[in-house]
Design a protein with these regions (language model features):
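Short, Lys/Arg-enriched N-terminal segments with co-localized hydrophobic residues
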Residues: 1-16
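Domain-level signal for soluble alpha/beta catalytic cores
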Residues: 15-293
Length: 293
């Protein structure tokens, strides 16, 4: 319901932006609640009752309807609402070569709730060729006009890096990448490939969605992480900054790049809390993006 949509103003360089090009004076993060029809179709596909083509047809129609609503509301960007995804982040990660879908014993822990237990595991070295999200973007691009910009939202490289070491995932990850620097370089290279392919498909606005910084601000999260004495907030934030900035190297000047720093949102609950003081000097001063939400 766009009438209840939260519009997010944001700041870059100390000034509220008011350009007709991104970054915009007001904006959205691009993810929308899934319609009941979409959830029912996805469940029917999982149960083997409809084909992939049938599911895609439902997605196409509902995304088209959503874009019409975004335009009618006067929004400067249009997105697919992330309607083709089961998770906001994992579907993109599963699209890399060398990555497969798995389930863990537990899902992500939110305030009083737990998500489905989806995750990932490596099957080989990570590359970014032929990523399915490029085709997803092309569908949205066709609706772009002189008043709107088609945006592609993707999880940040730091989020991918964190997922590779979530719970027991690190054991498999280290079997393919005993050298952390090689892993960081391959993640960044895979992202650069996808970014190039999106750009070649006409994308001029990409958003990194990133919960890693929010987790670094959460006292309870760090209490648990510090059971491993080798883990420090300085070390973790340095890794996250490095992989994100490496992924952004060489991007075209006319490609706007923003980031949404999120505390998690599942059934209106949160995964992390706390002020930005632990990460502000790194995140806001050194990450090479055009704007933050």
């Amino acid at each position: 319901n766009l009438s209840k949509l939260s519009v997010i103003p944001f700041i870059i360089g100390g000034f509220i932006m008011s350009n007709h090009l991104a970054p915009f004076h007001f904006d959205i993060v691009g993810s929308f609640l899934r319609p009941a029809e979409l959830k029912e179709a996805r469940q029917a596909f999982t149960d083997g009752k409809i084909s992939r083509e049938d599911l895609t047809a439902v997605e196409d129609r509902l995304i088209t309807d959503l874009i019409k609503k975004q335009k009618a509301a006067g929004l400067p960007v249009i997105t697919d609402g992330e309607f083709r995804r089961a998770y906001w982040h994992l579907d993109f990660m599963w699209g890399f070569n060398g990555v497969k879908e798995i389930e863990l014993e537990h899902g992500y822990k939110f305030h009083g709730q737990e998500t489905a237990p989806g995750s990932l595991a490596l099957t080989g070295k990570i590359t970014g060729t032929n990523h399915p999200f490029v085709e997803h973007f092309k569908f949205v691009k066709q609706f772009e006009d002189e008043h709107t910009t088609a945006r592609q939202t993707i999880p940040a490289p730091s989020q991918f890096l964190a997922e590779l070491f979530r719970e027991d995932n690190g054991t498999v990850t280290r079997s393919f990448y005993p050298d952390l620097e090689e892993l960081i370089q391959d993640i960044a290279a895979a992202y650069r490939q996808v970014i190039k392919d999106l750009y070649d498909a006409g994308c001029r606005n990409i958003q990194f969605d990133d919960c890693t910084w929010g987790m670094c601000c959460d006292h309870g999260y760090w209490t648990g992480r510090q059971k491993d004495k080798s883990v420090t907030i300085e070390g973790e934030t340095a890794k996250y900054l490095r992989v994100n900035n490496l992924a952004l190297e060489g991007r075209p000047q006319d490609l706007a790049f923003t980031t949404h720093v999120c505390r998690g949102n599942y059934n209106s609950t949160w995964a992390a809390s706390g002020g930005y003081e632990p990460v502000a000097p790194i995140l806001f001063a050194k990450e090479n993006v055009d704007a933050y939400y």
